[in-house]
């Protein structure tokens, strides 16, 4: 059985190994930069816009509104104790997909949204759906509390 450790391999193939190894490390680092699971507060922020919208499907297509939501989520992330560093954290596309997830669950939306719904999305949506008209007031209050630290 042949065994070659990194040092022996480096001696055998020289610079090519160093370049390959650096590229591999960079790839591994990029792979580990997957966005974390959405938090309850992040979902509430999206729901605020969702329930305020007359047409959630159109909201998902409104790049400016999705950018606004994304900006709020990123600002909250920066002041969080568990801040996540990534260029695509809660991107416009991520926000759009979250809105479409909620569209999939919403019995009032005729168009279908996305097929695979996160358990947390279904739970929080049904929780607020049960509250009827009170859901808007409660979400507005929660939104104000959640975003207070970034409104200074």
PLM regions and their residue ranges:
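Intrinsically disordered, charged low-complexity linkers and terminal tails
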Residues: 1-152
């Amino acid at each position: 059985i042949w065994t070659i450790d990194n040092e022996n391999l480096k001696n055998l193939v020289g610079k090519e190994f160093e370049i390959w190894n650096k590229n591999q490390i960079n790839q591994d680092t990029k792979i580990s930069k997957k966005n974390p699971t959405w938090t309850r507060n992040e979902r509430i922020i999206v729901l605020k816009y969702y329930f305020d919208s007359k047409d959630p499907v159109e909201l998902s297509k409104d790049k400016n509104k999705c950018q606004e939501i994304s900006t709020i989520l990123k600002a909250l992330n920066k002041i969080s104790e568990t801040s996540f560093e990534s260029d695509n954290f809660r991107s416009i596309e991520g926000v759009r997909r979250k809105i479409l997830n909620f569209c999939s669950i919403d019995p009032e939306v005729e168009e279908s949204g996305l097929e695979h719904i996160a358990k947390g999305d279904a739970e929080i949506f049904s929780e607020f759906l049960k509250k009827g008209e009170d859901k808007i007031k409660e979400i507005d209050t929660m939104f104000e509390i959640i975003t207070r630290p970034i409104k200074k």
